[in-house]
Amino acid sequence: MESLTDPSKLDSGKEPHISLIPNKQDRTLTIVDTGIGMTKADLINNLGTITKSETKVFMEVLQAGADISMIGQFSVGFYSAYSVAEKVTVITKHNNDEQYAWESSLRGSFTEYREFYKSLTINWEDYLAVKHFSVEGQLEFRAFLFVPRLAPFELLETRKKKNKIKLSARRDLIMDNCEELIPEYLNFIRGVVDSEDLPLNIFRETKDQVANSTIVQRLWKHGLEVIYTIEPIDEYCVQQLKEFEGKTLVSVTKEDLELPEDEEEKKKQEEGKQKTKQKKNQSLRTSAKSTYGWTANMERIMKAQALRDNSTTGYMAAKKHLEINPDHSFIDTLRQKAETDKNDKSVKDLVILLYETALLSSDFGLEGPQTHANRIYRMNKLGLGTDEDDPTADDTSAAVTEEMPPLEGDDDTSRMEK
């Protein structure tokens, strides 16, 4: 193409031709042409780079204003020569450069493959074989699969991992060991599969469950953004990562969480006698843990440990503090009933039920779920007008009339804060 736009580049041989010279004795095939030749930079870029992007060159030439009809019609696939030859030598001379010779044989190796394999497997030895391929269709992905030179140490173990194929999306690691990518009998293969089409979203059910929390909704009303840390490992990471880019990470379930407030709200809090948080929301109640101690997620993880330290659980699972909205009609009615009769069992049931329900809504667990269920049964019977002393009632509710904590006093405080 350059010779057509600038004929002076063919001054040394204006008659374009290609000669094929076979040599049966030396088993060689020589191809001679009278082209414009290549410079040293051309040899490095065009012949020394195997993965040179022709699409990128096409776009650059097209943006420069070249004739689109002449792009991509002068290449015959240089590396197809290695399908019949063990060594290829190119001798070329460009008008603006010296004569150079480029030579390559099939005995070469891929250094970048070796370095990538060692960094991927933490192995000091080279691989035995490699397969690099791409798949296009409904789901497009690229894969690097390596066969190790030696069998893995855990090959015959009964509790070994099924495979060690890493799955990534847009070069972001998604899974360290994706079992669905390769059969179990090929678990000795190491590699990476990368796709541009994999979604990077968490399960919507889990996200919606966290988003419906009354604590999160309260932050949204203040116009604050919330980071969802729903995976078990997130709890450990956040405990070590105290801040990010100068911003302190704060758990929304902590008691010392401070939110923006106006002057009127500050004044109302100072005058109030009950413990409330910065801004009243539409929720009837919520539950927050104390400043020091485990969050609800961390408490659930630690209680699931078979070899946990029970002494640590005692003080790390600290007191829970019930936060209420004193302006809500339910709280106001409950207060009036308590003032009328402090020994009313229904009031005591409602107070404890309110606290236990707040624990559940804040992802804390209940030590006695059956007691909680029986308390709900009693409130249902009260709502239906059923006499609790009716002999036809099931024995379960009667048997569950556990000792009710008094409405006031130290015993009630310890029960609520335990």
UniProtKB/Swiss-Prot annotation:
The UniProt record lists the keyword ATP-binding: yes
Location in or out of the cell: Cytoplasm
Gene3D superfamilies given in the database record: 3.40.50.11260, Heat shock protein 90, C-terminal domain, Histidine kinase-like ATPase, C-terminal domain
Keywords: ATP-binding, Chaperone, Cytoplasm, Nucleotide-binding, Stress response
Example of a GO cellular component annotation carried by this entry: cytoplasm
GO terms for MF: ATP binding; ATP hydrolysis activity; ATP-dependent protein folding chaperone; unfolded protein binding
Top-rank lineage group of the source organism: Eukaryota
Region (Disordered): 255-289, 383-418
Positions with biased composition (Basic and acidic residues): 265-274
Binding residues for ATP: 33, 52, 78, 204
InterPro entries to which the protein is assigned, alphabetical: HATPase_C_sf (IPR036890), HSP90_C (IPR037196), Hsp90_fam (IPR001404), Hsp90_N (IPR020575), Ribosomal_Su5_D2-typ_SF (IPR020568)
PANTHER family found in the cross-reference section: HEAT SHOCK PROTEIN 90 FAMILY MEMBER
Recorded family membership: Belongs to the heat shock protein 90 family.
Function: Putative molecular chaperone that may promote the maturation, structural maintenance and proper regulation of specific target proteins.
Subunit structure, interactors included: Homodimer.
Name of the protein: Putative heat shock protein HSP 90-alpha A4
Organism field: Homo sapiens
